[in-house]
């Protein structure tokens, strides 16, 4: 009954396009879903779930315990596998099952990235790979769901990318931030709601170096200097010093906000069920070796350092189970 009702709403759909205030003649849609229809997202997800099941693609678990993993958010898909052959097999099955329901993989927007591996592996791979007749560019970095993923897991490049995006938002609002008609507190609210979130998108998972923290601070002070302007002493204008900006702003710095967000997310992960993908990745210990010399900090190491700065690094996973206590810990980071 429900299927027939849905089909009835989709059959014989007439559309028109508004051009320069005038409507075009109507035309009938015989394929695809209607843009803006409340059912479109649901129907697409059902169709894609059916494709995944028939193709034998399993999104559960993690790559630590399987030869391949399929990650999907709407129509943004990621095939993760241990070998090129497994990637090719999974892609071929996905492509052929998707074609049966009228879905086509956009090969032009699909990229292939080798994570880890040696320089010899990268050289032998070349600049393109071909799978089932489709040619994909081999890349060193790729933007997935707004975040920059790199072959060497370089988070600093993602942070630089976020700062560049934040700079675009800043320049777009620069005229208002310089305006004498807008109160500085209102400008600060504009910064916190329209600019800072652009910079801190995905910050909960950042493992940051000291130079990354400094880059964030430099960006924030640039915005604050625009908001509060210079100061005149003895008829001479000078740029405000860092401590003067902090006193005028009166809010937690962007570095503290990033640290608090990371701790807040760590608490969420610690409280997740054991079969949750994020919890599985966090609790797992991948098989392999680490390079000689000084080791890169892991995300868990960063969280423990953040908690150590407020004296909460011991038994923090147990503390995370208490939401009220954990909220107090997060607030203490912002103070």
Language-model regions, residue ranges each:
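Short linear motifs embedded in intrinsically disordered, charge-biased segments
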Residues: 3, 15-335
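Short, well-structured alpha-helical segments
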Residues: 3-10
